[in-house]
Regions:
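Generic cytosolic/nucleocytoplasmic N-terminal low-complexity/intrinsically disordered segments
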Residues: 1-3, 9-12, 17-20, 24, ...
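Bacterial Sec-dependent N-terminal signal peptides
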Residues: 2-19, 26-29, 33-61
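Compositionally biased, intrinsically disordered low-complexity regions
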Residues: 7, 66-68
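Short, ordered beta-strand-loop transition motifs
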Residues: 27-30, 81, 412-415
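Extracellular beta-rich repeat passengers
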Residues: 45-53, 75, 94-430, 441-445
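Glycine-rich repeat segments that build the extracellular carbohydrate-interaction surface of secreted
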Residues: 59-65, 75-96, 106-113, 438
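Well-ordered alpha-helical segments embedded in enzymatic catalytic cores
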Residues: 70-73
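Glycine-rich, aromatic-lined ligand/substrate-binding cores of catalytic
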Residues: 435
């Protein structure tokens, strides 16, 4: 179901013809003129609320690409000008061809105004080669009001990875952005000390249907991050994990006021020294089952940290409170139909021990099934096949649909998008730590 909203995107499929660049240029010219609008509440984009940079900061206006005579205009401008603010034209498209590394400290944002969002999108080269990563970072980066589409503009192939942090202690921030389409992971850290912030944004469609262990929002790859912060955002349609700690110790984790919908993996914490997980909706998150009835797996899957020179497990403080975690009946029925799948219990024994010794506060969490006004349909054919085959793998059924969009075309059109509003009469509408609504604030206005 889809409903009218203030959110609007539009993209057009482009098929690259190696021997006919005039054809490609024509269509890329058309798409460059298409309008892209934001997925965030309207006030994010209004002129009166646009932040003007302080005097003295370098501001570089970058003209859009046409995909034929101009590509990589953004990264070329950064290499030429270094640290600064880079403004992208609203409605413009900025193509990334080949390997693109940002080594400077930059803010990349939409130009002043309330028009449609600029788009950053990969474009394969004349030989059809598509880089594995959209952007790699050796400097700090902030993105404000940008639409990222991880689908190749020429072939419609979906990228493996979108964003990689290559050096230590880097900061990556998304504010008011819409990010979609990748197979393995959206954000990956290849070094320690990273700080990743997602605020007032939408992230969706991260899935490798042949191997659904992939499809992650954040993946530490075992490199200890300083901060992971996801706030006021909507995340949906992932085969993998929201956060993959992968045995790395995060100093600070903040997951507050978000709406999560259709995520295959449960929430495993291995490890976090301080974590606040509160005021969220987890709708159909963690439908990948456990398989041992004698020792059921947990949704909140905490692991005990061993003491070391760097970390003392006695210092851990985790707060999981005022969240709504539920599974729709059509998924619940699969645990009965395919009894080799065991539905997850809320907490494991490690979590219970941490409650007993005061390191974990677990309170005021509810399980209330909500009816969203315009959420995408669950990909039940894919999910049911996953239940049916147990641990045999999904490669033979990788073509079953999982990715979603509003109208069968890439992106958003007709001022419509999926929405996640729910009745104000729901318990969730007053269940937050401040007695307000749970979930992303954009759906409660």
């Amino acid at each position: 179901m889809k409903t009218k909203s203030i959110l609007s995107y539009k993209t057009t499929k482009i098929r690259y013809r190696k021997n006919n660049k005039t054809f490609v240029k024509l269509f890329l010219g058309i798409i460059a003129a298409s309008l892209f609008s934001g997925c965030e509440p309207k006030d994010v984009f209004e002129e009166e609320n646009t932040i003007i940079p302080p005097t003295g900061q370098k501001v570089v206006r970058v003209e859009p690409d046409d995909g034929v005579t101009k590509v990589n205009s953004l990264t070329k401008a950064i290499k030429e000008n270094g640290d600064g603010i880079y403004e992208l034209e609203r409605g413009g498209i900025y193509y990334l061809e080949g390997k693109n590394v940002i080594s400077s400290n930059v803010t990349i944002r939409a130009t002043y105004g309330s028009g449609s969002l600029p788009t950053i999108q990969p474009l394969s080269d004349e030989q059809g080669a598509l880089n594995s990563d959209m952007l790699r970072f050796e400097g700090n980066a902030t993105f404000e009001n940008i639409y990222f589409n991880g689908k190749d503009a020429a072939s419609n192939s979906i990228m493996q990875r979108l964003f990689r942090l290559d050096k230590k202690n880097l900061s990556l921030r998304f504010e008011g952005c819409f990010v979609e389409n990748c197979r393995n992971f959206c954000i990956r850290t290849d070094n320690s000390g990273s700080k990743v912030y997602i605020d007032n944004s939408t992230f969706r469609n991260f899935a490798l249907t042949s191997d659904p262990a992939n499809g992650r929002l954040f993946d530490s790859r075992g490199n200890a991050p300083d901060t992971i912060s996801i706030t006021n955002s909507t995340v949906y349609n992932l085969t993998g994990q929201i956060i993959r700690f992968d045995g790395a110790v995060a100093k600070h984790v903040e997951v507050k006021n978000n709406t999560f919908y259709n995520v295959g993996y449960h929430f495993r914490i291995d490890y976090a020294m301080t974590a606040y997980i509160e005021n969220n909706i987890f709708a159909n998150v963690g439908w990948k089952a456990g398989y041992d009835a004698s020792s059921p797996s947990a949704f909140w899957d905490l692991k005990e940290l061993e003491k070391s020179d760097s970390y003392d497990p006695k210092d851990i403080r985790i707060y999981i409170r005022n969240n709504n975690i539920y599974t729709d009946q059509e998924i619940k029925a699969l645990y009965v139909k395919y009894p080799g799948n065991i539905e997850r219990v809320p907490l494991n024994s490690v979590a219970q021990a941490m409650i007993d010794d005061g390191r974990l506060v677990y309170e005021k969490n509810i399980s209330e099934v909500l009816k969203f006004d315009g959420a995408p349909a669950l990909p039940m054919a894919y999910i049911e096949k996953f239940f049916e085959v147990l641990k045999k793998g999904m490669s033979p059924w990788a073509d079953l649909p999982f990715y979603v969009d509003e109208n069968g075309k890439d992106g958003f059109t007709n001022d419509e998008t999926f929405t996640f509003r729910y009745p104000v009469s729901s318990t969730s509408a007053t269940a937050s730590t401040t007695n307000g609504p749970l979930g992303a604030p954009m759906w409660n206005q």
